[in-house]
Amino acid sequence: MQLSTLTALSPLDGRYQDKVTPLRAIFSEFGLMKFRVAVEVRWLQKLASTADITEVPPFSTQANAFLDGIVANFNEADAARIKEIERTTNHDVKAVEYFLKEKIQNEVELVKVSEFIHFACTSEDINNLSHALMLSTARDEVILPEWQKLIDEITRLAEEYKTIPLLSRTHGQPASPSTVGKEMANVVYRLKRQFKQLQNAEILGKINGAVGNYNAHLSAYPNIDWHKFSEEFVTSLGIQWNPYTTQIEPHDYITEFFDAVVRFNTIIIDFDRDLWGYIALNHFKQRTIAGEIGSSTMPHKVNPIDFENSEGNLGLANAVMTHLGQKLPISRWQRDLTDSTVLRNLGVGLGYCLIAYASTRKGISKLEVNQPHLLEELNQNWEVLAEPIQTVMRRYGIEKPYEKLKELTRGKRVTEQAMREFIDKLDIPQEEKLRLQKLTPATYIGAAVELVEKLS
């Protein structure tokens, strides 16, 4: 059976492959090879730029350009060659080293120093930096831009619907009114916090040998400050340096990275469920799309499938990333290999994220507030004005204001007339009575509009 979108085992590479395309060049095996090649080449160039390593003299402009070209022009044929070499070596990182030696075999200047490719490195020196570059690239080029799109869409809802009143529900029961826009603004604020946390998350790397002590480095060049050398190299890649490790970078930062994504996703799940509920309550209508079918047997159905799809995929994403976050920081003694197979799934959780984010945005694009229904619902719940009335009563020293409103309203459907009559009987200044008489459930929205306007 030929591999295709129809025969792929994972829906990421099958049904949903077009939605995860931006991640394939980063987290596929091709992507991992590309970053490994880049790290190996930059390490060789770093060695050549160090005067104390006389065996690797400074490279000429032509030699550096050739090496830069290997990195910049890395393609699928190169990746296929690495896989071919690996069939002999049975070692993926060693295959990259041999591939690079092949690439430079006709470059006299570089052939002379070919044994300094992968010099003093353990495989994990190359791998951890490659993984760091993968996560950094995905964050900056894919995930944060996707997050910004979602934030922008929900911000648009907040601004568009900032004045449309909404009957709130706490514990599922009618509560003090808000506005549709303010409820969207709450979500935006939460998402922006997580955006900043991922944006500022540290991405760490190390290059310090088989157990983190520069043993091999010092055996060959005991007079070089390898601690400083390591820091310079790691930071030159745009990665923060971790000076204290075993054979592996301990992956704590990966847990922190995925925890931030999981928190963002959890907020979106909350948003998806709220929108699903608002649609069920008829607060929102969904624009229909010609040709779409909601049910195989019930022709009338327009289901909130986009929010459901998002919720489901975010659940998968969070499950994968939570496992990575819990497993990766644990490695026996100076290292075991349990992290290796898990790290090959770095992009899986993020792939499910992309599917979900696209679904949430699609669901948002179909939304249309059902304002007449919202106003009708508010008009049926005059009891929500018990809160402002009893609060004003407290101000003017009326005895047991809460209890009096409780007796009038608790568990009851109160009419406008009943509330007006109650206000008329209050022993409070006339201007306060008039102010309370003007209140309706639709106008009792506090500072909701102003809070939306302050969001930006």
Swiss-Prot record:
Coding gene?
purB
Q: Which NCBIfam families match?
A: PRK09285.1, purB
PANTHER family according to UniProt = ADENYLOSUCCINATE LYASE
Kindly state the subunit structure of this protein. Homotetramer. Residues from neighboring subunits contribute catalytic and substrate-binding residues to each active site.
**GO cellular component: a single term:** cytosol
One GO BP on record is: 'de novo' IMP biosynthetic process
Pathway of this protein? Purine metabolism; AMP biosynthesis via de novo pathway; AMP from IMP: step 2/2; Purine metabolism; IMP biosynthesis via de novo pathway; 5-amino-1-(5-phospho-D-ribosyl)imidazole-4-carboxamide from 5-amino-1-(5-phospho-D-ribosyl)imidazole-4-carboxylate: step 2/2
Drop me one GO molecular function for this one. Answer: (S)-2-(5-amino-1-(5-phospho-D-ribosyl)imidazole-4-carboxamido) succinate lyase (fumarate-forming) activity
Alphabetically ordered keywords of this record: Lyase, Purine biosynthesis
Annotated Gene3D superfamilies: Fumarase/aspartase (C-terminal domain), Fumarase/aspartase (Central domain), Fumarase/aspartase (N-terminal domain)
Active-site residues per Swiss-Prot or TrEMBL entry: 171, 295
Q: What Pfam family is a match for this entry? A: ASL_C
Q: Catalyzes what?
A: N(6)-(1,2-dicarboxyethyl)-AMP = fumarate + AMP; (2S)-2-[5-amino-1-(5-phospho-beta-D-ribosyl)imidazole-4-carboxamido]succinate = 5-amino-1-(5-phospho-beta-D-ribosyl)imidazole-4-carboxamide + fumarate
* Protein's recorded name: Adenylosuccinate lyase
Q: Which family does it belong to?
A: Belongs to the lyase 1 family. Adenylosuccinate lyase subfamily.
Q: What is its EC number?
A: 4.3.2.2
Q: Where does N(6)-(1,2-dicarboxyethyl)-AMP bind?
A: 15-16, 90-92, 122-123, 247, 296, 301-303, 309, 335, 340-344
Function summary = Catalyzes two reactions in de novo purine nucleotide biosynthesis. Catalyzes the breakdown of 5-aminoimidazole- (N-succinylocarboxamide) ribotide (SAICAR or 2-[5-amino-1-(5-phospho-beta-D-ribosyl)imidazole-4-carboxamido]succinate) to 5-aminoimidazole-4-carboxamide ribotide (AICAR or 5-amino-1-(5-phospho-beta-D-ribosyl)imidazole-4-carboxamide) and fumarate, and of adenylosuccinate (ADS or N(6)-(1,2-dicarboxyethyl)-AMP) to adenosine monophosphate (AMP) and fumarate.
